[in-house]
């Protein structure tokens, strides 16, 4: 009997459709259940419809987020508990949560369940239960930690009253633990009883006040300092020591306005009997902030007055060194010849790599000898790819053999400078043979390999949860579970498992999670894993399209000269393939466009743009991002170094850097002397990623650098 293949295929398709329809229905139920429970909590009637909620949860059998639904119901019931709730109900709910934990001991939600029991016991005002529970589970939030300490103090007081004791060792231990929280936090919730007990026990000493002030100062917490200085206002008869209060006010003032430092530092400090200067930390820590209030172009920067401060305030040699490094960093580019001479002498003396590297970059764009600065680097600094490259270039004329040796070794590594080394070794072909030390691409193990079958079975429920959360566009929670999954894999070959799962993520088009997984696995040599071919068809469409051209900028919207590998390299560097990425400057989406840039580009290229939300949509973002790259390509034809610099830092800054270079710098010199650390690294990464993407896209004769990049003077 031969199987009817068409019949079997039809059955399979029908089953798939049935499963998909069931999933859609369950998804709708899940979302409606969440809304019902939200309303029930608001109306304080969760318990009135328990059967309804349980039936809805039961209907979610085999739905990946059924456990989330159960958790939402548990949370709603916890919120409904008060001190008037019968203790039997509280115990029953606690037991129910503990059963869920026992049945799912390794689930991502375990911590939420465990912490939920704290909230349950706090809401129920179950002092004894709270203390006992805290002995085996650690409370995570400050609010819960304080609640536990309050409960312990209450039990201890009851016990002492029964035994007619004044204090006990347990009492002292509670207050000691409270003190650690007080020292580490500017404000604590619901700590009135603990604070009063701690204060009445004489624990709020001047040493403790200054210890906390120093911590607040390090955190730049002016509000916390204000709270500390007014802390005794809560006690009618108490008054802060005048000197302490004056110092706390001074610390607050310094945090708000570092320019006032001389008012404190110019005075001779008060040295206490133990030879301690209690306000010293404020002077030490404010100095770098104070320097930022001074003009970098002041007539003649002079460190001598600050050396006098350092002497008066008894700074250690290490602290003076940090001050001098900060001073040099602030005025580094000052044009005063006396300062420059002193700066160079001090850099050679201090041997601080951050200053030495900055001086090296200055020497590169000024085209002066690098040797003294290369020699001043630490051993670690000299081993960086960048400085090995410049060492080779510096000695090229006098020792070609050594130069070739350095460049050859460098060309067997990954990165921008290895790629540059390969180009130097083979200038005619632009280093076309560069293979970053990997003649063959390292392929990550696949989770679908039979070898991983048991592991896949174990993690599949978590992967299904992640898939469903992403379907619901809950990308943040999905990423949290992804990281939890990868970081908590058990057994041997953890890195291989992490890589296999990252490969799986890329296969599911979870490109941001695939990249994230490759970082967690430290799979730096696995280029295919680190640089997935993401949203490939969108880039094809965007780069083939020719939007209407602006009359004022006839070339502005032409995408034809922007390569797919370059556009993808920019995206990978900008967002690590996270469509929801948002920077502190409000750049958004895959290609991290500012709304203002997006609007201007859309107007110029005649592209649709409805507002900021569009930038979180991959296709919209790619259309606008590639159009903006095309605008920059029109300005800097086929020069990815200038395009990438402008994309990151703005074209106005690129023009400024080109004006400084004045047509005298070679490509490597221009890149090394880009003043912004972020932009310098950005350009190097983008060009390297572009080369890798050309290989991954199987481009014939992948190009390291174009003629426009390599042959011109900048």
Question: What residue ranges belong to the model's regions?
Answer:
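Alpha-helical repeat scaffolds
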Residues: 46-57, 84-103, 127-137, 159-183, ...
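N-terminal leader/linker segments that initiate helical-solenoid repeat arrays
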Residues: 1-72, 79-82, 88-91, 434-462, ...
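Conserved small-residue packing positions in alpha-helical repeats and bundles
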Residues: 33, 74, 118, 149-153, ...
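Alpha-helical adaptor scaffolds
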Residues: 74-75, 114-119, 324-333, 342-379
């Amino acid at each position: 009997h031969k199987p009817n293949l068409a019949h079997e295929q039809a059955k399979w398709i029908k089953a798939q459709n049935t499963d998909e329809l069931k999933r859609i229905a369950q998804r709708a139920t899940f979302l409606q259940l969440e809304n019902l429970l939200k309303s029930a909590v608001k109306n304080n009637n969760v318990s009135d419809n328990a059967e309804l909620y349980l039936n809805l949860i039961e209907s979610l059998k085999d739905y990946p987020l059924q456990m989330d639904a159960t958790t939402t119901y548990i949370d709603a019931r916890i919120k409904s508990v008060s001190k008037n709730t019968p203790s039997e109900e509280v115990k029953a709910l606690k037991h129910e949560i503990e059963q869920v934990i026992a049945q799912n001991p390794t689930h991502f939600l375990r911590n939420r369940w465990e912490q939920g029991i704290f909230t349950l016991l706090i809401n129920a005002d179950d002092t004894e239960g709270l203390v006992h529970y805290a002995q085996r589970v650690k409370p995570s939030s400050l609010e819960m930690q304080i609640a536990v300490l309050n409960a312990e103090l209450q039990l201890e007081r009851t016990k002492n009253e029964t035994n007619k004791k004044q204090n006990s060792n347990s009492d002292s231990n509670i207050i000691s633990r409270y003190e650690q929280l007080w020292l580490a936090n500017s404000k604590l919730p619901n700590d009135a009883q603990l604070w009063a007990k701690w204060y009445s026990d004489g624990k709020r000493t001047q040493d403790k006040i200054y210890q906390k002030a120093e911590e607040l100062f390090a955190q730049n917490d002016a509000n916390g300092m204000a709270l500390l200085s007014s802390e005794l206002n809560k006690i009618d008869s108490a008054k802060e020591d005048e000197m302490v209060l004056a110092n706390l006010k001074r610390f607050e003032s310094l945090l708000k306005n570092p320019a006032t430092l001389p008012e404190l530092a110019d005075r001779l400090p008060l040295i206490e009997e133990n030879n301690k200067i209690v306000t010293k930390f404020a002077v030490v820590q404010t100095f770098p902030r104070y320097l930022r209030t001074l003009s970098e172009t002041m007539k003649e920067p002079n460190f001598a007055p600050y050396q006098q401060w350092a002497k008066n305030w008894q700074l250690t040699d290490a602290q003076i060194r940090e001050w001098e490094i900060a001073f040099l960093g602030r005025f580094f580019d000052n044009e005063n010849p006396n300062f420059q001479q002193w700066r160079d002498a001090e850099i050679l003396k201090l041997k601080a790599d951050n200053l030495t590297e900055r001086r090296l970059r200055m020497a590169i764009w000024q085209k002066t000898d690098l040797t003294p600065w290369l020699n001043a680097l630490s051993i670690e600094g000299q081993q960086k790819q960048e400085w090995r490259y410049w060492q080779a270039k510096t000695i090229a004329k006098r020792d070609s053999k050594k130069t070739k040796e350095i460049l050859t070794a460098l060309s067997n590594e990954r990165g921008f400078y290895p790629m540059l080394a390969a180009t130097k070794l083979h200038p005619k072909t632009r280093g076309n043979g560069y293979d970053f030390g990997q003649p063959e691409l390292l392929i990550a193990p696949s989770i679908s390999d039979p070898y991983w079958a048991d592991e896949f079975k174990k993690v599949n429920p978590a992967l299904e949860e992640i898939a469903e959360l992403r379907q619901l566009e809950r990308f943040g929670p999905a990423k949290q579970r992804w990281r939890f999954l990868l970081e908590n894999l058990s057994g041997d070959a953890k890195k291989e498992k992490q890589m296999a799962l990252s490969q799986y993520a890329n296969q599911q088009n979870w490109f941001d999670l695939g990249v994230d997984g490759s970082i967690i696995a430290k799979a730096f040599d696995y280029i295919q894993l680190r640089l997935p071919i993401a949203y490939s068809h969108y880039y094809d469409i965007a780069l083939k399209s020719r939007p209407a051209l602006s009359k004022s900028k006839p070339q502005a919207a032409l995408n034809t000269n922007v390569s797919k590998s370059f556009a993808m390299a920019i995206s990978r560097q900008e967002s690590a393939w996270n469509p929801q990425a948002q920077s502190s400057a409000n750049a958004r989406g895959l290609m991290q466009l500012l709304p203002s840039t997006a609007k201007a580009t859309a107007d110029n290229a005649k592209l649709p743009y409805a507002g900021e939300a569009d930038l979180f949509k991959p296709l919209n973002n790619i259309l606008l991002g590639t159009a903006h790259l095309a605008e920059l390509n029109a300005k800097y034809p086929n020069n990815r170094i200038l395009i990438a610099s402008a994309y990151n830092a703005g074209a106005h800054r690129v023009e400024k850097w080109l004006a400084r270079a004045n047509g005298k710098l070679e490509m490597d010199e221009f890149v090394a002397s880009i003043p912004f650390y972020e932009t310098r690294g950005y350009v190097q990464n983008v060009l390297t990623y572009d080369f890798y993407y050309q290989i991954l896209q199987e481009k014939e004769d992948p190009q390291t650098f174009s003629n426009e990049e390599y042959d011109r003077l900048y």
